[in-house]
Amino acid sequence: MFKNILIIGFGMIGSSIARSVIKKNKSIKIFAFDKSPNLKIRINKSKLKRVKVLKSLNEIKDQNIDFIIICTPMLQYQSIFKKLNDIDLQQTIVTDVGSTKVNIEKIYIQKKYQFNFIPSHPIAGIEKAGLENGFDGLFTNRYNIICPIKKSSKIHINKVIKFWKSLNMKTEIMSAKEHDKVLSLTSHLPHLISYSLVLTAMKKETSLNSKLVKFSAGGFRDFTRVAGSDPEMWRDIFLANSSQIQKLTSNFISELKEFSRNLNKGNSHNLLTKLKKLSLIHI
């Protein structure tokens, strides 16, 4: 197991990783690097005093970091990769928690970066951002998708898998392309729909606003909860996986238009047939 772990980007996901590692293994040292100027104060207030803050990534060698987890928004990856590549990381494995993989793999391969990179994506999270909202148990019984690059060492892949399993995660290996196709449907499009629905509700008359909150059922509340996710993170996800999301968006709009046509025509038979068919689907 790793001895010295650096978490780059110490938000909700990063702090949850730290909490889980600290609870399960008292001997592992945890380091954090983040652009937040008050990081050390916030970490201490969050009862994470075992986490040491690095002022610069140049301290990686001095601290004998053997495992790096990138937990930043994805548009920051390119800058981070460049900095990591300037450091001798032959004995270090780098992974990430990003929600898209094709774009990240492309950057790594095109720039011919040399550090040992094993992309991963823990399918876990809550809508609240910030290290204060992290908690131990976030990853328990959740899936983590590992997306090895062609030149990835099996030894390194297995070490990354072992690490995530130590946090009680289930792991699955996929190609970057397959990962992005699956997640565009199960996560990215639903988030886009949530934002769109809440925007639609916000544009209704002001007089309706209080009633929307008062009489919203579970479904609408779920949409508003999802729409409350970290804006910067989701902007990056939408842009990074835009081609897959745009294809699905077109399909989704077509389905909405068909529902609208049936409603306009009062076509009870078509509506009932479609709804009955969908009622048989259980995921």
Indicate residue ranges for each PLM-predicted region.
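NAD(P)+-binding Rossmann beta1-loop-alpha1 motif at the extreme N-terminus of oxidoreductases
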Residues: 1-62, 67
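Interdomain hinge/lid region at the active-site interface
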Residues: 209-276
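Rossmann-like NAD(P)(H) cofactor-binding subdomain of soluble oxidoreductases
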Residues: 80-132
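Internal alpha-helical scaffold of NAD(P)-dependent oxidoreductase catalytic cores
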Residues: 136-222
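Rossmann-like NAD(P)-binding element
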Residues: 58-88
